[in-house]
Amino acid sequence: MSANPRWDISRALGVAKLFHLVCGVREACVTPFLTLYLRQLGLAAPWVGTLMGTKHLIAAFWAPVCAFLAKSYRKRRALLIGSLLGSVGASLLMVLVPPVDKNRVHFPCNGSSGLTSTDALPGVTLPVNITSAQESASSHPAKRTAEVEMPGFRNPPGESDRETFRDLHVYLAPSVEGARTTSQALLHPVTSGLKDHPWEVTFEVVKTALPLLPGGKGPGNPANLSGTKGKAWAFDLSLEALRRTFILSLGSVAFWELLTAPLEQVADDSLYEFLDFVDATDRYRSLWVWRLLGMSAGVCGITALVGQLDCFLMTSGPRGVVHFYGYSVVSTLALLVSIAFPIPICQQWEPSYKRVKALSIVGGDPHLILLASTTVLVGAIVSTVQNFLFWHMKDHGSGELVMGFSVALSLLGEILLHPFKATLLRKLSRTGLVGLGLSCLAGQLLYYSFLWSWWSVLPIQILSAISNRALWWAVGASVEDLATPRMERALSALFRGHFYGSGCSLGSFVGGFVVMRFSLAVLYQACCVALLLWLALLLSIQRRLPRERKIKYSKLLSMEVSDTSDSEQGTEQDWLVKAMREEHSD
């Protein structure tokens, strides 16, 4: 069986590297910043978690189905082109989703300072009008001073004369029957004394009573102020607007993921089979570096463009539309490259029950069961970082350029760490690598919970590279040692797709509600404790499991065996005799 006669191996690898590079740039344009954009739409943490959980769930189970159905050359080519072409339009659907509050305040494009309500309070939309601090306050009646508490700004204790807006969960605010007073707040920032109290921001609130319209909506103000327990207040936003934004966002994200999820797996399967026909699969293993390089360049490039083009392209709606426009442009470039992507014409026969067999292999080995459980847990915890870390950084004053740079540091760290893979595997073993990865991830989460400045996230990103790479190195080594012949890729896809993806989905669903009920700092501290407890349990169980000894027949057969001597000394050095004696002694 020969490879596609129109392709030589060097040209095929060149196109594959370019495709991975462009796809990395494409993914980096939107994926790290999607939850930040959803927050700017006015969606609270539970709804953002639900959206991301749905996205991960579709990716975990829809991609293998499409890869199973697309086996022929024509189907794979059509799926690659259709996925990229459809994702161009699907990504632009997110730009059309209206925010919960269309009258919300945006950051001004003229360089002056401003405040966005959804940027200040995760899970809360405060429809307030921000006015300049230099305005004369004499023309505003009923003026009094109030303090708005935001994450990252500490409220000084003992000042009972100031009102603090807490637990403003818009999506849970019940409508109050009867007469109500609707107030429009004009907030004037008071910046005096910020040197002594840098975490305290005081606003002058001017309340003007407005007549109440039927249904409880005041003119020009979408929020109704209703009393809650203590001094907490809730703004009763239109549930219809919230429901509309959430449903449109859910539909757009789900449709978008249905189109994009199969792309990576189908492309990888096609390239691997193409190289397998010419016995060049060893060159397939280095292609992941090009995707990470593309993501590193893309995440820095798109954040630089956002600051320059966002105000030029946007007149209304939330910031961040440049991410989706950039994604569409790079997807078009990837579409052009995909036309030349190597796909074998001759179909390689593979049993259709590989996934089921891979699952049975995992279920029959206690070491793989522990590794699968660890992968699910890590996926759940990593999803909380991916979903809400940028929220945490935003609350501490970080811009998107700093956020992109933090992602690039982590990705470049993974590339620089790769040459040490063999050394770490030899020194630490698979269990040691898992322990190293879990420890680094726990320390990383604990550090995130105590962020203090806009730049403070950058030094810890090296641990992100170690924690991510260490886990997948351990998975790869376990698959290589314990998998039966020609089941390595199926087992690896099971860990990366089903187990890790299911964990990300579960973590997204749960994480949003934890953020709503407590805070991001509490979420990260709880995840840190969970990781340390699981690490202790993992090490205690691992010691009690029988020590497996698998003969790597594929490696043994590749060794050059000298048969020039039939002496007893030659027999003692024979690799097959050694392997049989080791197996018999165990």
Curated annotation (Swiss-Prot):
Recorded superkingdom: Eukaryota
GO cellular component: membrane
Record key words, sorted: Membrane, Transmembrane, Transmembrane helix
Cell location: Membrane
Membrane topology: Multi-pass membrane protein
The keyword Transmembrane helix appears for this protein: yes
Span list, region Disordered: 133-160
Protein family according to the UniProt entry: Belongs to the major facilitator superfamily. MFSD6 family.
Name the UniProt record assigns to this protein: Major facilitator superfamily domain-containing protein 6-like
Biological source species: Homo sapiens (Human)
Gene label: MFSD6L
